[in-house]
Amino acid sequence: MREIISIHIGQAGIQVGNACWELYCLEHGINQDGTMPSDTTVGVAHDAFNTFFSETGAGKHVPRAIFVDLEPTVIDEVRTGAYRQLFHPEQLISGKEDAANNFARGHYTVGKEIVDLCLDRVRKLADNCTGLQGFLVFNAVGGGTGSGLGSLLLERLSVDYGKKSKLGFTIYPSPQVSTAVVEPYNSVLSTHSLLEHTDVAVLLDNEAIYDICRRSLDIERPTYTNLNRLISQIISSLTTSLRFDGAINVDVTEFQTNLVPYPRIHFMLSSYAPVISAEKAYHEQLSVPEITNAVFEPSSMMAKCDPRHGKYMACCLMYRGDVVPKDVNAAVATIKTKRTVQFVDWCPTGFKCGINYQPPSVVPGGDLAKVQRAVCMISNNTAVAEVFSRIDHKFDLMYAKRAFVHWYVGEGMEEGEFSEAREDLAALEKDYEEVGAEGADDEGDEGDDY
């Protein structure tokens, strides 16, 4: 079996996690208490969904996941929520005091006390796997727990499970909407370790997803639940081929191979189509070319950056539902002829496609319409650098005055770490610039950087 362990860190990670597991359970017909009426082979772990769920002898299906937070309120909601019987109590780990939006608390003081317990739980989950494939890590880098404890856990996972792939779903601060003043500090410090310790990181940002909800679903005031359900569709599409059998399966390590041209250039944009409300879907059925064009639209991107400002290095298209390879090839051929979607000159083909016949599921009473076919795109585009330069700019404004730095130093950080992380990000921006530059032949002498 090729199992995947999901790790949800901090409030954002946990709430996205709730949406994801809710959707997985719906897709597999697993009840809220973990029973699965359709599973006839009780205790036999060869079903495809066992990549994400382990089965007990009594026929209960338990998610291979842990939820970690430094303060209890968010995890208590899981403990008392609709899916409380789904998770093993040991999988829900909460501390007593908050990271207070402070990377240093999450990484050094408060996080240090809880990280061994987390790794112990991960070890238990890993021992339960026959062929662990990798980890999905969910966190936000604006707060303290997601950024600090997230980085710490990733660093420790690299030590314990060096060869396993780690995919991050990371919520980055939005350009306009901010939930904390020190977001730029936390993001820069955290990205410093994401660079080192994740194999692929998918960037999400709330503002972009708010806009998609407003525009495509006509929700005037989207809540986090609306956002998370949209995010969970993307994550579900990414992992469909691990959980169901399909025509062209896409493995987690395949994402890495196909999307990451250089180890550091691994920050991805994602988009999903069709995002339509039930009222609209009732009157229109979208074809493969239509949804394929939709995922390349700048307005469908789940992070605030414009792919037209950059070039694509690679992209993965995961189709699900009523889709045949012939349609996909035709749609991709059309995209290639379009001048709007530009690829770097050293990577002319750039498309990886997966098809899965399991149609997309939707949460009953949710906002998304039930559709026959959907597509999710994960793309590596040089425009992602916009996200970093925006955060770096805000970081510089504050750091020039050393504003708020004492809170970090007081928790045992050194000021040098700020400048080190900032330099690393400056180098990353430069890397993206070089990768997108015309003509790859003149860069032969700079191969040592990677």
Curated annotation (Swiss-Prot):
SUPFAM superfamilies per record: Tubulin C-terminal domain-like, Tubulin nucleotide-binding domain-like
For the ligand (Mg(2+)), the binding residues are 71
The protein's required cofactor(s) are namely: Mg(2+)
Q: Could you say which enzyme class this protein belongs to?
A: hydrolase
Q: Which residues bind GTP?
A: 11, 71, 144-145, 179, 206, 228
The protein's GO terms of the molecular function aspect are: GTP binding; hydrolase activity; metal ion binding; structural constituent of cytoskeleton
> Where does the protein end up?
Cytoplasm, Cytoskeleton
Signal peptide boundaries: none
Annotated catalytic residues:
254
Q: What is its main location?
A: cytoplasm
One CC-aspect GO term: cytoplasm
**EC number annotated for this UniProt entry:** 3.6.5.-
Q: Which reaction does it catalyse?
A: GTP + H2O = GDP + phosphate + H(+)
Q: What is the superkingdom listed in this entry's lineage?
A: Eukaryota
The UniProt site entry described as Involved in polymerization is assigned to: 450
PROSITE patterns the record matches: TUBULIN (PS00227)
Keyword terms, alphabetized: Cytoplasm, Cytoskeleton, GTP-binding, Hydrolase, Magnesium, Metal-binding, Microtubule, Nucleotide-binding
* Entry-linked InterPro entries: Alpha_tubulin, Beta-tubulin_BS, Tub_FtsZ_C, Tubulin, Tubulin/FtsZ-like_C, Tubulin/FtsZ_2-layer-sand-dom, Tubulin/FtsZ_GTPase_sf, Tubulin_C
Q: Which GO terms describe its biological process?
A: microtubule-based process
Q: How is it modified after translation?
A: Undergoes a tyrosination/detyrosination cycle, the cyclic removal and re-addition of a C-terminal tyrosine residue by the enzymes tubulin tyrosine carboxypeptidase (TTCP) and tubulin tyrosine ligase (TTL), respectively.
Q: How does it assemble?
A: Dimer of alpha and beta chains. A typical microtubule is a hollow water-filled tube with an outer diameter of 25 nm and an inner diameter of 15 nM. Alpha-beta heterodimers associate head-to-tail to form protofilaments running lengthwise along the microtubule wall with the beta-tubulin subunit facing the microtubule plus end conferring a structural polarity. Microtubules usually have 13 protofilaments but different protofilament numbers can be found in some organisms and specialized cells.
Q: Which family does it belong to?
A: Belongs to the tubulin family.
Q: What does this protein do?
A: Tubulin is the major constituent of microtubules, a cylinder consisting of laterally associated linear protofilaments composed of alpha- and beta-tubulin heterodimers. Microtubules grow by the addition of GTP-tubulin dimers to the microtubule end, where a stabilizing cap forms. Below the cap, tubulin dimers are in GDP-bound state, owing to GTPase activity of alpha-tubulin.
User: What's the protein called, per UniProt?
Assistant: Tubulin alpha-1 chain
Biological source species: Hordeum vulgare (Barley)
